[in-house]
Amino acid sequence: METPPRHRDGPVRTTLVAIGLAAFGILASQFTVLPAFVLDPALATAPADASLVSRTVLLILNFLGFVIAGGIYLAGTDRGWSYVDVRLPSKRGWLYVLAGILGSFVFYVLVTLIVQTLALPSAENQVSMYIGNDQTMVLIMIGIVFFFNAPAEEFLFRNIVQKRLYAAFDRLTAVVVASAIFALIHILSYALFADSLLATLVPITVVFGGSIIFGLLYAKT
């Protein structure tokens, strides 16, 4: 993806801006979920026992924060929505998409095998406390990931953060830096449920690796 013709920034400033964007997305999410807590206060005390509707609303609103943060950045920097890449991939692009999907599947299978073989501890994500053992919520979460999670994260971390890093880095370096930022913002959500540092690092490594794959896919398509 090509970026608009703007001057190249220094790597430090560009990285700080990218980190700020990610942090802004997380901060915005803390406010966008507030209506869900008003709808069902049980979300704050016993998340797994809250109503199905309120849990669904909360998880959807959480990702809305990323979209709002990205939109504010685009407006504040006069980049506008034309800065966002929204188009169907070319025939070659679809091949990259298929390769990315296959690559991510193989990556997660290999990581799972390594974790199981070495008996490595791995913390649950904070989202798990809203799902609990509710199989219906598991199915709903799959839909949320597909329709809200993935689009929101791709919008903020690929279309904006990663592209912003192009101003100071080559494509590959930008992908690595964006993936590192993406992994870092997930630390707290895993650390809250981890029994050890290793239990936090294992899923964070998985997040980083998966982000590398999708970052490369975005850069190629």
Language-model-detected regions and their locations in the chain:
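N-terminal, membrane-interfacial amphipathic/helix-forming hydrophobic leader that caps
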Residues: 1-94, 102, 108-121, 213
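Function-critical hydrophobic alpha-helical transmembrane segments in multi-pass membrane proteins
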Residues: 127-187
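Non-cytosolic membrane-interface motifs at loop->transmembrane helix junctions
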Residues: 53-55, 126-131, 197-204
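Hydrophobic alpha-helical transmembrane segments
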Residues: 15-20, 56, 94-98, 139-143, ...
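Membrane-embedded alpha-helical segments of multi-pass membrane proteins
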Residues: 60-65, 139, 204-209
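Interfacial helix-capping/hinge residues at the ends of transmembrane alpha-helices
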Residues: 81, 158, 162, 211-215
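Functionally important transmembrane alpha-helices
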Residues: 169-221
